[in-house]
Amino acid sequence: MLNHYLPVLIFLLVALVVGVAPLLMGSSLGPHRPDSEKLSPYECGFEAFEDARMKFDVRYYLVAILFILFDLEIAFLFPWAVVFDQIGMTGFLAMMLFLAILVVGFIYEWKKGALEWE
């Protein structure tokens, strides 16, 4: 039974070696000669005038999280719709429970004012 998973295990091991081996070789075989010029911040050939990080409003992150949430909802909804005629009432009720939980979460976010930009 586990013989069917042997190609997957070999693939994962080869992928791990291909991904990690160049990193280890570069860090162990490469020259390590840091000086003050190499360690200084560099911005388009000039020293950085100020901190390059800009402050973002937290609401942008909230919108991004809500987008990911509803994008995942669609990712679950499409395969469910494809096999809808084969899964019966149990699959239907499971998806309705999933959608109800998402709707309750959306209503909670709306009532808390997380979607308002005032």
UniProtKB/Swiss-Prot annotation:
Reactions mediated catalytically: a quinone + NADH + 5 H(+)(in) = a quinol + NAD(+) + 4 H(+)(out)
GO molecular function: NADH dehydrogenase (ubiquinone) activity; NADH:ubiquinone reductase (non-electrogenic) activity; quinone binding
GO cellular component, one term: plasma membrane
Listed EC numbers: 7.1.1.-
Pfam families linked: Oxidored_q4
Keyword Transmembrane: yes
Entry keyword set: Cell inner membrane, Cell membrane, Membrane, NAD, Quinone, Translocase, Transmembrane, Transmembrane helix, Transport, Ubiquinone
Signal peptide: none
Broadest EC class assigned to this enzyme: translocase
Segments passing through the bilayer: 6-26, 64-84, 87-107
Subcellular localization, as worded in the UniProt entry: Cell inner membrane
Membrane topology of the entry: Multi-pass membrane protein
Binding partners and assembly: NDH-1 is composed of 14 different subunits. Subunits NuoA, H, J, K, L, M, N constitute the membrane sector of the complex.
Function in brief: NDH-1 shuttles electrons from NADH, via FMN and iron-sulfur (Fe-S) centers, to quinones in the respiratory chain. The immediate electron acceptor for the enzyme in this species is believed to be ubiquinone. Couples the redox reaction to proton translocation (for every two electrons transferred, four hydrogen ions are translocated across the cytoplasmic membrane), and thus conserves the redox energy in a proton gradient.
Family to which the UniProt record says this protein belongs: Belongs to the complex I subunit 3 family.
Protein name, UniProt field: NADH-quinone oxidoreductase subunit A
Species, as recorded: Acidithiobacillus ferrooxidans (strain ATCC 53993 / BNL-5-31) (Leptospirillum ferrooxidans (ATCC 53993))
Gene behind the chain: nuoA
